[in-house]
Amino acid sequence: MILETINSPADVKCLSEEQTATLCRELRCFLVEQVSRTGGHLASNLGVVELTVAIHRVFDTATDRLVLDVGHQCYVHKALTGRRELFDTLRQFGGLSGFPKPYESVHDAFMAGHASDSVSVALGMARARTLLGQDYHVVAVIGDGALGGGLSFEGLNDAGGSGEPLVVILNDNGMSIDRNVGGLSKQLSKMRTDPEYYEFKKRYRKALEKLPAGPTLYEWSHEVKTALKKTLLPPVSTVFEDMGFAYMGPVDGHDVQRLTAVLQAAKEAGRPVLVHVHTVKGSGYDYALREPEKFHGVGPFDPATGKVRQAGKETFSHVFGETLRQLAREDRRVCAITAAMADGTGLTDFAREFPRRFFDVGIAEGHGVAMAGGMAKQGLIPVFAVYDSFLQRGYDMLVQDMALEKLHVVLAVDRCGIVGADGETHHGCLDYLSQIPGMTVLAPASFAELRQMLRRAVLEMDGPVAVRYPRGGEDGYDGDCGDESVTVLCQGTDAAIVTYGILTQQALRAAALLAGEGVSARVVKLNRVAPLDSDGICRALDGVKRIVAAEDQLRAGAVGERLSALLLEQGAGTEKLVLRSVGTTLPSQGSTVELRHALGLDAEGIAQAVREVLA
């Protein structure tokens, strides 16, 4: 196999046209085989095989800077840069990350995980190169979905006018950008992606400049050319050229030789260039072609049938979606908003049943929050379902366009806490919502509590409300005490464990472990984590002087620190308080079980914290 001989990008550059085509076929087989075992982002990687190979044929990623937007399409890049043999550990604890990580390889220029930032990052690198007098090329790869994020246009607007040599590759796999129409347009696009065309342009301008009326002739011909482009080329081309980019494309993203030639021309252009590439998500694997969304992020599956090996388990996301549908039937003011994550957040069925009350704003969380504020202001009840780590992108709007006016917007915040295999960029471990004035934050620990809390948040409460819940399903606790702000689940006199959300079951198990050692541990569950119920917490902790606060959040500003301040202010007489949290840095990837154990947030870790507080 040719793939087995590829240990660095230098090996890719040496291949013949036939060998390169074979390599692409082998890479697709490799991707399907490996991801079927570990799970991961398959469809997007199948779509960029030829593009990634072409990038490595033209650029040297050991010195050049390759910035991948979102980053989940990095598998081919990793396979070609000396990490092929690590794929058995893909997205596993201590293994190969599913996203670019500079600590993994010199070929990973920048950590990625969220959308729309690649052009801004690439421009920063290009400007640093110029100011420091360095010599390297900068390439950003961004998808048409990420292009819908406002940050991408901020970056494009600045980059196009900067004059900095850099290449932006627009990976258009969603057909959301206007297509070129007609034979003449196709021929013109073909000409514009030919390196000889750009060499001719340089010679043409130099020749005209030698004539007495040369500058005038050049300006006239430039105006004629611009008018023709606007008539014959897809409108998207003129958008980028108006920003200051040289536009090359559209290019067949599965033609390695054509891609190589175009990228070489872009590399030599000496100015901002946008290369528009058409790819097909899931290319080369029929099941992913038919259901690209299913195979966007997929668990282990049978490659022969495309069936996921473990499917059908009920999740918090599913329960949220079903509950919101019921609430929408009861109240016509209820609307649902998502940011390009309808399936992931459990809103697919809602969209089918209530198409006029469902709004997918694309990868634009800030816009989603601000729009929800406008809807609430006019009397609707908007529910914005969004992943915790993605909602961070709309923080300013949470304050300015929602909280300051005390608007009744409900945030259904999915993937809170430790999320597992996607690692640092996807954990929901920043307790930023509790810092927002007037925000109520609820934390269900079971499906029953999610149903009850969501109903209260939508139909009974006022002002901004966030309901935070984890990825996946229940952890063994299936109680329903969500109507109280604080609940004592287990009585004890020696120490108290204060926790909330998905860690509730771990706290109960810890209390059981300690009981076997003769230690009486009280378990206090917080259902409302912001604002904290001072009186309720003090009553729940009455008589206990040693306390452990356990939460799957970064320590700074989270419940543990706020609980500590509350007890001090109330003069509760606490003798010792141990904060058991994620700590000060976001953890890498791994299963939830593995990460909890490593962080001391499983039953044994919490029990050990109680032993320490009693020592």
How should each PLM-predicted stretch be described?
Residues 14, 173-320:
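Long, well-ordered, tryptophan-enriched scaffold segments
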Residues 41-162, 316, 333-334, 338-339, ...:
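Cofactor-binding active-site loop characterized by glycine-rich and histidine/acidic residues
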Residues 86-96, 161-175, 196, 403-415:
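A glycine-rich helix N-cap at a beta->alpha junction
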Residues 218-287, 408-413, 430-479, 603-615:
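Structural signature of the thiamine diphosphate
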Residues 234, 261-264, 296-297, 315-330, ...:
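Glycine-/acidic-rich phosphate or pyrophosphate-binding loops and their flanking alpha/beta elements
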Residues 301-303, 308-312, 420-422, 440-441, ...:
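Peripheral docking tails and interdomain loops at the edges
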